[in-house]
């Protein structure tokens, strides 16, 4: 029943000068996996890692070549067997570690501010720009709804005020007109009932005409005020979006993918929207072209500048090692994964000169075939003694009921860091 369970351990292997490789170690029957087997596994992995990162593409890119990502490669050692493959670090195996300031109270939970990034076809897409487009569309819809609602509310309020003002003005106008009419009638026309009726009719006609003109003028003023309010709202929204973007870019705690367009942040929103729409259309066209031309090579991708782990850059590839039950009579030469000193090319990068793990080809090769032209050296004698002592130590060791990785991890800490 112990073979059913698995133990997953996440480690970081330091390679080159300033890089770290995420390792996902999946153990079957982990109770019998001891420290010696772990060290033996490390010596094999160093050659595989060196060969994989020989061209340097895996350090700064998430693109996996078909030969390295097609199937898992089985390798069998003296006691255990395992399969190995590489996978993109992001997004499935996300190792976006942030630089966090040291806290006074370590027991408090750590709050990490992060800027989301989206990888589409191995290309980085900034989620802030995409979210701005959606937010702008939503804001426009909300504005229209608010303007319609505000329009109804404002009309209701203004109608009451207008009625009161008009009533007051009509009363004052009536008084003025009555005073004028009385003065003119006293001088020219004698007072009589027919003249009073005519004057009353004239007064009513004048007040209605004035009301219609006033209503038209007020409606024009309302439209102007609404247009000014909409412009003010657009300006405020633009400022809020710009402030939000600058705060995220200026935050020292956040590690994000640096773009070359940092100087163009203060452009108008219309230009940004047009550019984003064009980019989205181009991305859709590129996706369609990639789907139609699956056999063709992909276009150039942006360099992978992922997270940091204790000041070291996390590589774009994650190594996945899964132990398997050893098959009787099945062997795979380890030398095909190991890069010998003779195979070194002059085009190799300088970063690999400072490879931390020891280059021990004699320890890795366990085949009995030896070339007759090769002479024995001190290295071969030391390896023979080391292998004999290792066999003696293995014969003395017995499987334990508990895993020794949790207790005896002194050798593990030399190569891996959790």
Swiss-Prot record:
Comp. bias (Polar residues): 359-374
Transmembrane residue ranges: none
Basic and acidic residues bias spans: 136-154, 209-227
Region of interest (Disordered), ranges: 123-174, 209-231, 258-302, 344-418
Name this protein carries in UniProt: Putative uncharacterized protein DDB_G0288959
PANTHER family on file: MYND-TYPE DOMAIN-CONTAINING PROTEIN, NF-KAPPA-B-REPRESSING FACTOR-RELATED
Species per Swiss-Prot/TrEMBL record: Dictyostelium discoideum
Lineage of source species: Eukaryota, Amoebozoa, Evosea, Eumycetozoa, Dictyostelia
Ranges of Low complexity composition bias in the record: 266-293, 375-390
Biased composition (Basic residues): 391-401
Acidic residues bias: start-end ranges: 156-170, 344-356
């Amino acid at each position: 029943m112990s073979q059913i369970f698995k133990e997953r351990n996440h480690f970081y292997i330091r390679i080159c000068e300033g890089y770290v490789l995420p390792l996902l170690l999946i153990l079957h029957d982990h109770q019998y996996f001891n420290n010696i087997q772990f060290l033996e596994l490390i010596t094999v992995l160093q050659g595989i890692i060196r060969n994989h990162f020989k061209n340097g593409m895996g350090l700064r890119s998430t693109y996996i070549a078909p030969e390295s990502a097609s199937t898992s490669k089985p390798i069998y050692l003296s006691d255990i067997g395992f399969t190995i493959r590489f996978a993109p670090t992001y997004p499935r195996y996300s190792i976006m570690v942030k630089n966090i300031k040291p806290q006074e109270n370590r027991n408090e939970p750590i709050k990490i501010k992060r800027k989301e990034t989206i990888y589409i076809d191995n290309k980085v897409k900034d989620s802030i720009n995409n979210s701005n487009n959606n937010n702008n569309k939503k804001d426009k819809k909300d504005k229209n709804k608010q303007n319609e609602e505000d329009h109804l509310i404002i009309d209701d309020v203004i109608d009451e005020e207008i009625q009161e003002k008009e009533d007051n003005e009509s009363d004052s106008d009536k008084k003025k007109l009555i005073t004028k009419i009385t003065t003119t009638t006293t001088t020219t026309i004698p007072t009589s009932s027919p003249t009073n009726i005519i004057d009353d009719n004239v007064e009513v006609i004048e007040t209605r005409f004035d009301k219609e003109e006033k209503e038209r003028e007020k409606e024009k003023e309302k439209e102007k005020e609404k247009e000014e309010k909409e412009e003010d709202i657009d300006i405020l929204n633009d400022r809020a979006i710009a402030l939000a973007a600058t705060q995220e870019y200026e935050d020292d705690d956040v590690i994000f993918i640096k773009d070359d367009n940092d100087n163009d942040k203060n452009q108008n929103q219309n230009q940004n929207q047009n550019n984003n729409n064009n980019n989205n259309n181009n991305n859709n066209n590129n996706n369609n072209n990639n789907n139609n031309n699956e056999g063709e090579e992909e276009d150039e991708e942006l360099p992978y500048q992922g997270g940091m782990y204790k000041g070291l850059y996390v590589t774009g590839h994650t190594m996945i090692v899964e132990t398997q039950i050893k098959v009787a009579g099945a062997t795979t030469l380890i030398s095909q994964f190991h890069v010998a000193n003779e195979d070194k090319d002059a085009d190799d990068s300088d970063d690999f000169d400072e490879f931390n793990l020891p280059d021990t080809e004699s320890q890795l090769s366990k085949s009995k075939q030896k070339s007759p032209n090769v002479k024995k050296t001190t290295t071969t004698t030391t390896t023979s003694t080391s292998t004999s002592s290792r066999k003696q130590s293995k014969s003395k060791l017995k499987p334990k009921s508990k895993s020794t990785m949790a207790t005896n991890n002194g050798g593990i800490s030399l190569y891996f860091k959790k």
